[in-house]
């Protein structure tokens, strides 16, 4: 692991928001540690060891977001899109990916031989593939003057459709 961090037994617990996740990245960087898990309230405590509650601090989240902007759109998009996944463990995977990119720069996004980068790429691809599937096959019907449809996505892909709808 080329970045300076110790893998610890402690799990990070945060509020489930994207800003909260960015605060987990900040905490990991500040403490020079990689947690054993990063869990949101829906997941509960998954390990027997200590849990550190990470409070959402907008200033810290903004600092990490600015850092992601500096790394370029590929890195930021991979983390933002990956965050929409509902796969267990995605938070830790994305945290490790962010740490790798902060340590090695924007070129780290292309290092698919690295397990952290490959796992983040797989998460992003799964979300984008599902979003593409739904955008191609979704059919709306009219009821009482409103258009609607019922879908059951695995990931939180509906957020990706808002920019598509605004462009039309």
PLM segments and residue spans:
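Short helix/loop capping segments that flank catalytic or ligand/cofactor-binding pockets
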Residues: 22-23, 158-160
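Flexible, glycine/proline-enriched loop segments at strand-loop-helix junctions
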Residues: 111-114, 148-152
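Short, flexible loop/turn elements at secondary-structure junctions
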Residues: 16-18, 142, 153-155
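Type-3 copper protein
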Residues: 128-148, 162
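Conserved small/polar residues in nucleotide/adenosyl-binding loops
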Residues: 161-168
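N-terminal ordered "arm"
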Residues: 2-58
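Charged, alpha-helical interface segments at or near domain boundaries
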Residues: 51-131
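Extended, Lys/Arg-enriched charged tracts that mediate electrostatic binding to polyanionic substrates
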Residues: 150-152, 156, 163
């Amino acid at each position: 692991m080329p970045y300076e961090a110790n893998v610890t037994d402690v799990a990070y617990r945060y509020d489930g928001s994207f800003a909260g996740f960015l605060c987990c990245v900040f905490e990991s960087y500040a403490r020079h540690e990689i947690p054993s898990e990063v869990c949101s309230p829906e997941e509960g405590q998954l390990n027997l060891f200590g849990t550190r509650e990470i409070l959402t601090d907008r200033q810290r989240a903004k600092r990490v977001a600015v850092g992601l902007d500096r790394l370029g759109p590929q890195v930021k998009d991979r983390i933002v899109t990956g965050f929409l996944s509902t796969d267990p463990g995605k938070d830790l995977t994305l945290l490790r990916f962010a740490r790798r990119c902060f340590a090695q720069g924007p070129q780290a996004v292309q290092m698919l031989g690295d397990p952290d980068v490959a796992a983040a790429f797989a998460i992003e691809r799964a979300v984008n593939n599902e979003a593409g599937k739904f955008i191609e096959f979704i059919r709306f019907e009219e009821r009482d003057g409103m258009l609607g449809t019922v879908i059951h996505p695995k990931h939180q892909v509906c957020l990706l459709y808002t920019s598509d709808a605004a462009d039309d």
